[in-house]
Amino acid sequence: MGYKYRDLHDFIKDLEKEGELVRIKEPLSPILEITEVTDRVCKMPGGGKALLFENPKGYRIPVLTNLYGSEKRIKKALGYENLEDIGWKLYRILKPEVPKTFLEKIKKLPELKKLNDAIPKVVKRGKVQEEVIMGDINLEDLPILKCWPKDGGRYITFGQVITKDPESGIRNVGLYRLQVLDKDKLAVHWQIHKDGNHHYWKAKRLGKKLEVAIAIGGEPPLPYVASAPLPPEVDEYLFAGIIMERPVELVKGLTVDLEYPANAEIAIEGYVDPEEPLVDEGPFGDHTGFYTPVDKYPQMHVTAIVMRKDPIYLTTIVGRPPQEDKYLGWATERIFLPLIKFNLPEVVDYHLPAEGCFHNFCFVSIKKRYPGHAFKVAYALLGLGLMSLEKHIVVFDDWINVQDIGEVLWAWGNNVDPQRDVLILKGPIDVLDHATNEVGFGGKMIIDATTKWKEEGYTREWPEVIEMSPEVKKRIDEIWDRLGIE
């Protein structure tokens, strides 16, 4: 059975049947009130339920939050019980095996057909363009949230921001926040490390305007893939097609030479003129749990807004963890593990805890084979895409479960001599990190929490870990039910 959801409407119907969605009929304001309700739900055990606010004050369009905010729902949205299976599919695209014999070529055909079937498909019309607004554009007609009291304004937080490389024409779909500046203007938060920022600076160098489209919704994997740290050569909508095993259908923009999902709820078209001065963007209550200050970013001019007849405004709340992004980050962690293992076969597992905002801590377990192996792995991780922004990398032995914070702290505290096992370096840091003296550049820490060898400067005999004998464990297993312990 193939992927069954055509759009968000299909998905939330299924969630409602399974008791995973709550319809809220009470009128609530998009200014702070919807955030407060969502924040409380996100902090419930397991992430809480998806929330559909049917009557946002002053708007006809309902607001959907916390859609991906549990392990169950993110798995359901992507259509996989084991998310690492998606990673292995991505691995086969990036590192294809070249068939050596005719028989191997024949065996490769079904896989090549699946890849071909996943290529995005442009269609003549889609539901997203059922209603068209050009000329008298007003972004304030959309129930865009102001999330936190000191935010600089209302922000679109779950838009798939679509641009094309001005030189190569390669599409990028990224998840960048957008601040409403005026009824037809947005500030685009293109951080320096992101592909959208590269497109902007290329357009500026070439003296061209950069066309932009923002899609809200679509098939459930689409908002996720916009957040995924894919290599620049991998099209996000192709990746979504690989996940669904069918193509993402796209429609051509009405005022821009870009395509966006035909089954999206809402799309916003426009352009950025790199010759214009940058504008103030922020403050914004971010996923770090702190406000990011005002900074300068490009301004987007909106030329059209299109939407379905019955649109839903999908948005996400970010703030002090845990929030919905805990589960989006967890999905990325699981999906990209196979690619990390390909580059570093000694890696057993890794974990980017949401409490560390994904870029503050990386816990990794390895099969240690030689002195200094932990540092070698840490250096390599810092060379992998956005892993370069990690601030603390802690390396453990293969038998430590890095998903278990109790085991992590036990091994870290017992195995580390700060004078010997800690290395301080400098490098790129996430621009949202407020602890560094310079924006985007600061210190990093590598910690070797593995068992130490004499060649690494350890001069004593390393103690054995306490373990019960297997015979006793087996004996107690056999009689456990008779002990009356519940």
From Swiss-Prot:
Transmembrane segments: none
One annotated Gene Ontology cellular component of this protein: cytosol
InterPro entries linked to this entry: HBDC, UbiD, UbiD-like_C, UbiD-like_N, UbiD_Rift_dom
Pfam families: UbiD (PF01977), UbiD_C (PF20696), UbiD_N (PF20695)
Alphabetized GO MF terms: 3-octaprenyl-4-hydroxybenzoate carboxy-lyase activity
GO biological process: ubiquinone biosynthetic process
Family from the record: Belongs to the UbiD family.
Name this protein carries in UniProt: Uncharacterized protein aq_1612
Organism listed in the record: Aquifex aeolicus (strain VF5)
